[in-house]
């Protein structure tokens, strides 16, 4: 009985903490919100430069001589809203559906009760009628686990760190009432994908869609501390945003599905380990820097390859170089003629 009472109390507290009312917010929507920020499309619309990824040094690496054909500006990318895309499930990838499944920046009206004047992510997906289909709304590149001088360039911009247990996930959405389900996909450093169901978008107006961990026990899960973990290097504890995924059932007649996303936040328990304060092991052995740099090198090479591959449809290029690249990227060691990050 006590456990049940505690669970009810936690539910009420977490509702107040994370699931705010959506109808009565005016300028209060600008105040600081709880949880760790994963993505804020209003911030990305204002200035995406902090998420810039420069791939220009990798063009000749993936295709010898291609730097004379590829424009340098095409190889500098960021998480700006215009760079996001919709990827339909294979069964729905007919030209008409692909052409009309797009993302676009959308300005919230000044009289809106929430996020007035902000520019957010607008999504339109065109599905076949009476067909079970899904689509992913994806960033322009995989979020790097390690990038920038400190390796933390993308923290709060698609990347979260030091995760022990995921408690809650919140997506602020404006829906037009379509019968479609929304999921959030994350990926850890081992390539494991995690799908979190946020529920239906069959409502009109603003809402905070929330996933809560059904296995999380408050005041117990957060207190479980294992100090038998070596201080350095720590095991993988980062997760990156992979995509939003929307799905519709075969019974739905609707084809057009439109909705808007303001931001994505998470609540989680953090890893608790004792800190080696006497010696800076990273400055001595550089395990994080070495593994992070190699991970970023591979990510940049693959992202560059994808972009050059798209250009290849418009420009005549020999087939052999692409096969050579595929073989090289799998076998080449980091120190062997790799471009600088």
From Swiss-Prot:
The cellular location(s) given in this protein's UniProt record come to:
Periplasmic flagellum; Periplasm
Does the UniProt entry include the keyword Signal?
Answer: yes
Entry superkingdom: Bacteria
Record's signal peptide: 1-19
Annotated InterPro entries = FlaA, FlaA_Spirochaetes
Q: Which Pfam families does the record match to this protein? A: FlaA (PF04620)
What are the record's GO terms for cellular component? outer membrane-bounded periplasmic space; periplasmic flagellum
> In which broad location class does this protein mainly occur, judging by the first location in its UniProt entry?
periplasm
User: Which keywords does the record carry?
Assistant: Bacterial flagellum, Periplasm, Signal
Keyword Signal (UniProt)? yes
Function of the molecule: Component of the outer layer of the flagella.
Name assigned to this protein: Flagellar filament outer layer protein
Query: What gene is this protein a product of?
Result: flaA
